[in-house]
Design a protein with these regions (language model features):
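Dinucleotide-binding Rossmann-like beta1-alpha1 core, especially the glycine-rich loop
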Residues: 1-28, 156, 307, 316
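C-terminal catalytic lobe of FAD-dependent flavoproteins
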Residues: 17, 53, 61, 114, ...
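General small-molecule cofactor/ligand-binding pocket signal
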Residues: 68-70, 209
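Core beta-strand elements of the Rossmann-like FAD/NAD(P) dinucleotide-binding domain
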Residues: 91-100
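Glycine-rich, N-terminal phosphate-binding loop of Rossmann-like dinucleotide-binding domains
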Residues: 105-106
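A conserved short coil-to-beta-strand element within the FAD-binding core of flavoproteins
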Residues: 71-86
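C-terminal amphipathic alpha-helical interaction region
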Residues: 372-375, 391-411
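Helix-loop-beta segment of a Rossmann-like dinucleotide-binding subdomain
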Residues: 6-10, 26-65, 87, 170-178, ...
Length: 411
């Protein structure tokens, strides 16, 4: 299977699939469990260090290309004219009409359909996947490990992430679309499997840096309910003339970040065919260069360590932050002393990246909450520093802080 993967991928990242003997594994991974070790296959893949920022940058690039973006506005229901979908009703009271509506609500696809038509049949199987982040200790692997979990045979992985390890995953049916988090049972399972894979680690609950959970919007098939791991990961784009389709509507079922570009292309092509529109431009980006930041980009007065963090987190988009600093040198200062976030990041996130809450800022823009840093004890100080920079009232600062603490419980 991996050789087929390599052939289809064309080895875009270098390296090649090859087998490793048990002896080689013991030498390369001395902390790896010894019993039952027969060998392994090695392959090369890409890693998105900050998937949250990838999504944000896709959104801002779309806006720069002419799209509209309404943060914090929910589609309450679809508007029907007889049997055809003709528009949407928004949570702020607006009614928007269009010749074609695309329901790309992820794991909320069914909820939107059922709010619009109570008899709508579910199209998704939703499962929860949870992960924990642990410190990567001396002697632990610098490359990812993908094995079968000892307790249940599920796919299980440890993936290096900076100085940490992402450990996952679980696969559990989840029916509540608005609330999800890693349960204690899942955390215990992940800790136990990590310790079995790396027996010398002896990880404890106190070692957990953070948890992450998400909901997979998997396509529901007819027939009896099957085991979570057996549900197909293939996506579907359902148009008006497809089975389960409705006039005026495209439903996106399934999909994930890995395939977001091809899924978007497939959806847009279907929409253009429905609307009778011909493509005038190609979005192929093989020749687009995304230059990395160099020391020549560092504004005068910005600490080199802080510059390097901005370069790592934002890539070429960091130039927008540096432009702000060149206009106002005070934005090069740390937001709070002792944490590597500068004031310019906050201004950039709120003025150019649609950040509206503290959770937006620190979990999906500045990425502070994914760092193994002592920010947990300083949430109030961080909230007040942001409030001062953005001229929040005391009441707004209190409300933002309270909302952030609630959001952190789901991390």
């Amino acid at each position: 299977g991996l050789w087929l993967y390599e052939a289809m991928a064309g080895r875009p990242f270098g390296g090649e699939v090859r087998s490793l003997s048990a002896e080689t594994l013991r030498r390369r991974f001395p902390d790896f469990r010894k019993d039952g070790l027969r060998g392994a296959l090695r392959y090369v893949d890409a890693q998105v260090r900050y998937p949250e920022r990838l999504v944000v940058e896709l959104m801002t690039d779309a806006v720069h290309a002419g799209a509209s973006c309404d943060i914090g506005v929910r589609v309450e229901a679809l508007i029907r004219d007889n049997s055809e979908i003709v528009g949407v009703e928004l949570s702020d009271g607006r009614l928007l009409y269009a010749p074609l509506i695309i329901n790309a609500a992820g794991h909320w696809v069914d909820q939107l359909m059922q709010r619009s038509e109570s008899r709508a049949r579910p199209m998704l199987h939703t499962t929860r996947g949870s992960h924990i982040m642990l410190p990567r200790r001396a002697g632990h692997p610098a490359s990812g490990l993908y094995v079968q979990a000892r307790s249940d045979g599920r796919p299980f992985f440890l993936i290096p992430w900076g100085d940490s390890l992402w450990v996952g995953t679980t696969d559990i049916y989840h029916e509540q679309p608005d609330h999800w988090y890693a349960t204690e049972e899942e955390i215990d399972y992940l800790l136990d499997e990590a310790n079995q894979l790396l027996p010398t680690a002896d990880y404890k609950h106190d070692d957990i840096i953070l948890t992450r959970a998400g909901i997979r919007p998997l396509v529901r098939k007819s027939g009896p309910r099957i085991k979570e791991g057996a549900v197909s990961r293939a996506h579907q784009v359902i148009g008006p003339r497809d089975a389960r389709g409705e006039p005026g509507l495209i439903n996106l079922l399934g999909g994930k970040l890995t395939t977001h570009r091809s899924l978007a292309e497939e959806t847009v092509r279907k929409a253009m065919k429905i609307l009778g529109v011909k493509r005038s431009h190609s979005t192929r980006s093989k020749s687009v260069v995304l230059p990395e930041l160099t020391d020549a980009d560092r504004p005068e007065g910005l600490d080199k360590t802080l510059f390097e963090r901005v370069a790592r987190v934002y890539g070429p988009y960091g130039r927008d932050i540096f432009d702000l600093i060149r206009t106002d040198e005070s934005l090069a200062a740390p937001l709070v002393e002792g944490l590597p976030i500068i004031k310019g990041e906050i201004v950039h996130a709120t003025s150019m990246e649609f950040a509206a809450t503290l959770d937006d800022l620190f979990a999906r823009r500045c990425m502070l909450t994914t760092e193994d840093l002592p920010w947990h004890e300083r949430t109030r100080e961080l909230a007040e520093a942001v409030g001062e920079l953005l001229h929040w009232s005391d009441q707004e600062c209190d409300e933002q802080h309270t909302t952030w603490l609630k959001a952190l419980k789901q991390h």
